[in-house]
Structures are given as C-alpha cells and as structure tokens.
C-alpha cells in the first residue's frame, strides 16, 4: 500500500498537456497559438494568507483546494491552516501553514524560476520544500521575525507544478513563478548522458575503472560535445528525484541529444530506494523522453550494457536484466524514439571473446597493482578503461546505424 501511494504521487499527475488550461491563464497566455506552444507571458504571483493582498498578487487561503477550474490550490485542506498577524506588510503579515501537503499549479511544460517567502513575524518557522519530488529547499529553521527567501529553477515536464511542504512550522507567505527565457540551439549539438556507473566518468584516482561515457568522444568529430551526467548507483527513479534529470533539462538546447541508459539499479529489488518495476521503468523513461522533446532535444534510448554473466551450458553470455531490456524496447516502439540495443551488441561482442577473453574488459585486478584497488577486485559489472572504450565503440556504432543527424558525426574509421 505504501508503494502504491508513492507511485500515485509520482505518476498520478497529468502527463502531457491537458485539453485546456484553467481560467487562471486566460489573460496571460498568448492568444491564437496552439495549446502546446502557449507559455506564460508574465510571472504568476501568489500571496498566501487571510489578510490584505499585495498588489499584483492572487490571494491563496487555507480554504483554496485545488480544482481543475481554478488551476491551483492545496491537495489536502486537512493539513492546512492560516493566520494573520496584522501589520502593513501584505506579504509577511499573514501566512498559510502547511504540514505535509502540496500546493499545485497548472502550468505549460517549460523551465521556471520560483521565488518563495516563508516566515512569521511572531513565531518560529521550520520548512522543507520539494518541487516535483526534488528537494529544492533543504530543511531550514527561522526564529520569529526572520523569513526564508529562497529561489530555485525547475524544469516542468507534466503540466502541473507540485510543491510539497513539510516541517513543524512550514509557513508560506508568497510564491512567484517566472517563466525562463527559451533557449536556442547551439552552433553544434551537445550530447547529454544520463546513466549509471557503467556510463559515468571516473576521477583519475579510480584508475583503471572507467565508464563508456568517458571514452566515447574520440569516436565522434571534434565539434560533438559530450556532457556526461551519469553517476553510480542511480536508477531512472533516483536520477530523477535527486534532481539530476532536472539539471540536464534546464541546460539542454534544441538540437541537443539525451542518451538514456539505466537498468542495472532499477532491477535492484532488495534496494527499494533504487528499485523500479519494469512497468514503472517505462513510465520513468517516458518522463525523460517527454522532458527532452519538450525542449527541442532528441532522446536516444540505450538498453543496459551486459554484465559478464556466462552460461557454460550454451557457451555464451546471458542477457542481463531481460525484463528491463524488453521494457525499453517497448518504450522505444510506443514513443517512436531511437533505440541502441547495447544489451544485444555487448553480449554479442562478449561471445566473440569467450569467458577468459572478456576478463580484460572488466574490473578483474590483482592485489597491489592499482592504488584504488589495493586488495584487488573481481567485478563482472564495471569496466576497465579498455573495456569502457570497447563499449563506447559499440555505442558509436549504434549511433552510426540509427541514421539520425548525429550519425554523420561518427568517425567511421575509429570503429574498426
């Protein structure tokens, strides 16, 4: 039940643009444009509390439940109350106290800057703020008369901003939502990599461990810029809730690429923080795809690279995480997004080398040879530099075969 509630919070929100926006936006949307092209023409300003309303702000009280018609409001009024301390400052003299509930606003998918004021002239404040499940305001405490003034950016994907407020005394005074200026294409495309430890770039102190993302640039022309945001231990879920996808989407430009390879940690059923079922894996992948395409970027799905998992009976290597490989292939088919089947490519490559021949690819190291691994290691998941380079070659080969604009940037002579 707990997992179902969590999934409802993450997935129950609107996916894509709704059939129409509420009356809240009727005067600020650019008339005559297709709905998908509409953007906020001016900031939205909310003044929380029952007292006087600041000029240019929309009042939000503890009685304002979210409705589609209103387009904003609280999701659970039982966890919301309000106070008015009085005074001449319309913003800071009153507030709405929120204890474990969300304030949601229907917005066009885009990038925004949010500015929040939280505090109380006569009492303490203790507040944490999550935006789209990402912690944007860490736990912060203020005494009477002090106010939290926080600003942060957010890449909105699903058409409804959700701000979740927690803390013993989360007192909201004001919120301003400002649309960011749309980015334009760069002179040359950048390729953003979103993935796990098999993709990430490692510090030199970790030699000889490497991910294929740090070895891929030589297979492409010099104009191609790779931005590797991959990091170990992440699944499609944790990469998102930790704000790593958000960081990519707030920087990616039209014409850029987003390469997506997850699966190793999504399948970790004994680690519920990371674990994502194959069905939910597809939901998360579609969120990545939607976020990229909304910003004019081109997503490319990459099935999880194979582990060194040998089947002696068939004298061949097994497909790693087959349910996730299939789920990603289905996602590519359902969305029309390009797919590189690195799972298949890597396992086929391992088969040409055999059990012993694959040892130099993976982190199988003797004790005392490398400072990062003084006791040695036998790791059939992660790569040495040579192995990472060979996997990068397979990815580049996959890009070449996709027949997308980036394909022309592959140095074919380096694939031999």
Regions of interest found by a model, annotated:
Residues 9-24:
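Sec-dependent N-terminal signal peptides
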Residues 244-389, 393-412:
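Alpha-helical cap/lid subdomain in secreted, periplasmic
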Residues 37-202:
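Compositionally biased, intrinsically disordered or flexible polar/acidic segments
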């Amino acid at each position: 039940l707990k997992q179902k509630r969590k999934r409802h919070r993450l997935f129950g929100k609107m996916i894509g643009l709704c059939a129409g926006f509420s009356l809240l936006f009727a005067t600020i949307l650019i008339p005559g444009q297709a709905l998908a092209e509409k953007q906020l023409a001016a900031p939205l300003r909310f003044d929380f509390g029952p007292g006087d309303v600041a000029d240019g702000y929309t009042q939000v009280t503890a009685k304002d439940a979210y409705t589609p018609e209103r387009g904003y409001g609280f999701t659970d009024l039982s966890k919301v109350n309000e106070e008015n301390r009085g005074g001449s400052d319309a913003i800071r003299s009153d507030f709405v106290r929120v204890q474990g509930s969300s304030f949601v606003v229907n917005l066009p998918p885009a990038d925004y800057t949010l500015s929040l004021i939280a505090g109380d002239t006569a009492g303490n404040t203790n507040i944490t703020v999550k935006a789209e499940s990402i912690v944007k305001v860490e736990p912060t405490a203020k005494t009477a008369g002090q106010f939290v003034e926080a600003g942060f950016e957010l890449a909105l994907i699903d058409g409804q901003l959700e701000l979740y407020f927690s803390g013993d005394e989360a007192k909201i005074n004001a919120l301003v939502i400002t649309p960011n200026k749309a980015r334009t294409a760069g002179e040359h495309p950048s390729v953003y990599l979103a993935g796990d430890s098999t993709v990430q770039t490692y510090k030199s102190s970790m030699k000889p461990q490497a991910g294929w993302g740090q070895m891929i640039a030589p297979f492409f022309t010099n104009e191609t810029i790779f931005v590797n945001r991959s990091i170990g231990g992440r699944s499609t879920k944790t990469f998102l809730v930790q704000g790593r996808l958000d960081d990519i989407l707030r920087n990616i430009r039209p014409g850029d690429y987003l390469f997506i390879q997850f699966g190793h940690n999504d399948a970790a059923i004994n680690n519920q923080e990371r674990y994502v079922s194959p069905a939910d894996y597809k939901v998360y992948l579609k969120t990545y795809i939607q976020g990229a395409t909304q910003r004019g970027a081109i997503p490319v799905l990459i099935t999880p690279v194979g582990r060194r998992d040998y089947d002696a009976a068939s004298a061949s290597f097994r497909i790693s995480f087959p349910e996730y490989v299939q789920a990603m292939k289905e996602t590519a088919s359902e969305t029309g997004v390009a797919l590189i089947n690195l799972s298949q490519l890597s396992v086929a490559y391992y088969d040409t080398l055999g059990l012993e021949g694959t040892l130099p690819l993976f982190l199988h190291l003797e004790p005392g040879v490398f400072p990062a691994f003084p006791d040695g290691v036998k790791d059939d998941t992660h790569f040495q530099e040579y192995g990472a380079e060979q996997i990068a070659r397979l990815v580049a080969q996959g890009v070449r075969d996709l027949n997308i604009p980036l394909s022309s940037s592959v140095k074919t002579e380096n694939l031999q």
